[in-house]
């Protein structure tokens, strides 16, 4: 495996969230995919990022070279359908939920998705002044500190099971992927033996 650093985003140095930013990211990464395929060194390419900008286009490029292309949302959803009859998504708040809803429809899995639930945090944006960001919460979790985002994520995952009928939990934005082991443990502690997926591992496994 090799990690390609990707192209510098033309809109600025922050995470994609709006449709315009997703379009810029899609265009930039298609060039990276074609370049990787043309080397002849790889038999698979994995697109990182929960919103998977440019996935369908990159998959089309990959077919020209016999290279498998996987992405985080697609991989989680289809593995989820192998593990249960239905799944729910734990995501950040805001417009990303709407974009992710459209991904579910694109992949024709709206009949298997029970809900998209929010943890109440959005991605850091230019001009944000709130000191309590998802990045801060992620760093706190890494240090082993007790924090609200893990509790919220476990609560939403349990609600997806109890109220929505989900049999598998998946994660939306890649900024939430760090929550996977904490959600899995939190659900187990509450008596739920339910698979919890995250995009990076799912994409690698599907590529294999």
Please provide the spans of the model-predicted regions.
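N-terminal beta-loop-helix "entrance" segment that forms/cooperates
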Residues: 2-27, 127
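Glycine-rich, highly charged phosphate/nucleotide-binding loops
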Residues: 16-36, 147-156
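Structural beta-sheet core signal
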Residues: 88-91
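Glycine-rich beta-alpha junction loops
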Residues: 5-7, 93-96, 118-123, 173-177, ...
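Active-site rim beta-loop-alpha module in soluble metabolic enzymes
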Residues: 93, 101-172
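Short, acidic/small-residue loops that bind anionic groups at enzyme active sites
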Residues: 56-83, 183-207
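Glycine/small-residue-rich hydrophobic helix-like segments
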Residues: 151-196, 200
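N-terminal glycine-rich phosphate/adenylate-binding segment common to multiple enzyme folds
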Residues: 23-62, 69-73, 167-180
């Amino acid at each position: 495996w090799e990690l390609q650093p990707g192209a510098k985003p033309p809109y600025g140095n922050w995470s994609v969230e709006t449709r315009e930013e997703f379009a810029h990211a899609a265009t930039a990464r298609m060039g990276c995919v074609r370049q990787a395929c043309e080397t002849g060194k790889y038999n698979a390419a994995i697109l990182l990022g929960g919103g998977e900008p440019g996935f369908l286009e990159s998959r089309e490029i990959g077919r020209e070279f016999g290279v498998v292309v996987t992405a985080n949302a697609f991989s989680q959803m289809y593995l989820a359908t192998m593990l249960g009859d239905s799944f729910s998504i734990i995501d950040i708040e805001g417009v990303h939920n709407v974009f992710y809803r459209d991904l579910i429809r694109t992949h024709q899995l709206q009949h298997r998705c029970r809900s998209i639930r929010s943890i109440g945090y959005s991605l850091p944006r230019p001009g944000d002044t709130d000191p309590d960001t998802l990045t801060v919460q992620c760093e706190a979790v890494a240090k082993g500190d007790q924090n609200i985002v893990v509790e919220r994520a476990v609560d939403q995952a349990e609600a997806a099971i109890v109220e929505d009928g989900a049999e598998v939990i998946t994660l939306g934005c890649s900024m939430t992927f760090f929550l996977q082991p904490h959600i899995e443990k939190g659900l187990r502690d509450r008596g739920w033996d339910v698979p919890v997926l995250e995009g990076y591992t799912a994409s690698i496994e599907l590529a294999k």
